[in-house]
Amino acid sequence: MTLEKNRHANKGTSWTWMIYKFVVGVITVAILVLFITQKSVSQAQDKLRVEQQAIFSDQDTLQLKHIFHHGTGPKNYRLHRRLDITSEYLAKHQPYFTTLTQQLSEPVLEEHIASDNLDKIYQQSDWPEIHKGKNPFSIELPFKKADSEATRLKERNTLNFIESYLNYARDIKGDAQILNRINLDWIHDEIKVPNVTDRDTVVTLATISSNAYVRYPKDDDEKRKSDWIDLGDWDPNREDDDVNFGWDDIGLRGHVFVSKDNKTVVIGIKGTSGAGLPGGGSDETGGNDKTNDNLLFSCCCARISYMWTTVCDCYEKTYTCNQDCLEKELRKEDKYYQAVLELYRNVTDIYPPESTDIWVTGHSLGGALASLLGRTFGLPAVAFEAPGEMLATRRLHLPSPPGLPQHMENIWHFGNTADPIYMGVCNGASSTCNLAGYAMETTCHTGLQCVYDVVTDKGWSVNLLNHRIHTVIDDIILTYNETAPCAPSPPCRDCFNWRFVAHDDNEKDEPKLPNPLRSSSKSTLSTKTTSLKSSSTYSGSTSSSTVTKTTQTSPISSASPTDQDPPKKCLKRTWYGWCTKWGYDDDDDDEDTFERK
């Protein structure tokens, strides 16, 4: 029994020893494997870290650094100032920003506003829901870049070169043959552009467009300049109460966002006043905004009817406008296009364009100005819900590389099919724009159009509320998984029924268009000339005589003509739209008219 017990004990000890050796072996092998693979794991981690850094470098953030204000109008067009958004500035106005952030954090109870009240629509708060509770002055916005090519003027950044070119192009009426003789130097550059296929980048640019509506702390110190820096050689009289600064008078405003490495700069140009944050309103720069709207987007100085006050004196007679006058009005120093050129010049004084990627963006009027500025200097431009600016581009004779396709212009227009201003249908006697005093008669855009078809996809109806940048960001862009596809604009022509003339002896006016409204039932006179040979024995000579025969012919018509058919063109209307005078475009005032009473 004792031997048997010892045998079982030895057997148990051997099994324990075997298990022990097995465990030790496994642990040893595991340690060896970990030790061997440590180097490869470290290399993989380093590679992953590099890839993450590349991703973060591709997706940087933008933050508001400067605000530029350029005065316009006859009084303040020489006024130009800059406000730097520094940490000291943010600390100085911390109570205001705290209050503003609380206001933006609260749910907005939007009052019921009729879609035909444009002024109240503009006065609504338009800060996007996605950024509620964030300070517009310190918000950081992500973005991504993409590689692209740009063809632009070599001397575009030379002082006064662009202005001299535009003056020369205006003097020669934009004649392409003459412009080609001066042999402009075009260069091809590899540049960085916003990645318009990335939804976050598009939202960022739209937010910058919305940020341009933001008002700054409006206290007495700010009114008297305090933080503003004078630019240029003109310093207004600070004791003159008629000269206001910043937001308080007519002018153009640009909010400048800069990346952390100072390599990317985005200029957000303010659109039509009224669509601001709490504390804003249509009384900021609304009057001058409307003047520039009507100058840029109407056929002839907002000449809709004799009841309208035109913004310039270029109208001559029914559907006839002076082209030279229009071009000079757009280039005046107190208008927005000249102001945006000078604003860009002052931005490039801080951020040299040779070493900085400069983009421009804006909403509505600001988007159109961004497109004009981008085409002038060859900058990438992204516009949101902008009216058609092709007509203004041609009137300004902006430089365009010969043969450059639209997809290489680096201009993108984002819009939706339910916005009547973007679609160019907010016109006519009963339209909301006309009732509010806006002559939005243009439809055609330059560059690429990126259109969200919300009418088909969401069943929306055309409504001015869909023009707001807040609606565009929260209810359109963020509700789609991808950004809208961008495509070249279809063939388009604005103001086809207008005749633009130039009072220059060396310049031929546009020929009169054939009148399709002439009544086909009127009798016409046709003159037939025949040569008849006749023989004469007088003096033995033969002579030929020409007989002119005039006959009256009438076209064959199944309908019996009346004695006095009414003309087909309305030349004069009452204020409520009733036509009181009929005639033709080429008729005199006292001939071929029909009065309806």
UniProtKB/Swiss-Prot annotation:
Positions on the Lumenal side per record topology: 37-597
Subcellular location: Endosome, Multivesicular body membrane; Prevacuolar compartment membrane
Ranges of biased composition (kind: Low complexity): 519-554
Keywords from the named record: Autophagy, Endosome, Glycoprotein, Hydrolase, Lipid degradation, Lipid metabolism, Membrane, Signal-anchor, Transmembrane, Transmembrane helix
Catalytic activity: a triacylglycerol + H2O = a diacylglycerol + a fatty acid + H(+)
One of the protein's GO biological processes: piecemeal microautophagy of the nucleus
Organism annotation: Candida albicans (strain SC5314 / ATCC MYA-2876)
Active site: S364
Gene3D superfamilies noted in UniProt: alpha/beta hydrolase
Subunit structure, interactors included: Binds to both phosphatidylinositol (PI) and phosphatidylinositol 3,5-bisphosphate (PIP2).
Function: Lipase which is essential for lysis of subvacuolar cytoplasm to vacuole targeted bodies and intravacuolar autophagic bodies. Involved in the lysis of intravacuolar multivesicular body (MVB) vesicles. The intravacuolar membrane disintegration by ATG15 is critical to life span extension.
GO cellular component terms given for this protein: membrane; multivesicular body membrane; vacuolar lumen
PANTHER family per UniProt: LIPASE ATG15-RELATED (PTHR47175:SF2)
Region spans: Disordered: 507-570
Spans traversing the lipid bilayer: 16-36
Membrane topology field: Single-pass type II membrane protein
Glycosylation sites: N195, N262, N346, N481
Protein name: Putative lipase ATG15
GO terms of molecular function: phospholipase activity; triacylglycerol lipase activity
The encoding gene: ATG15
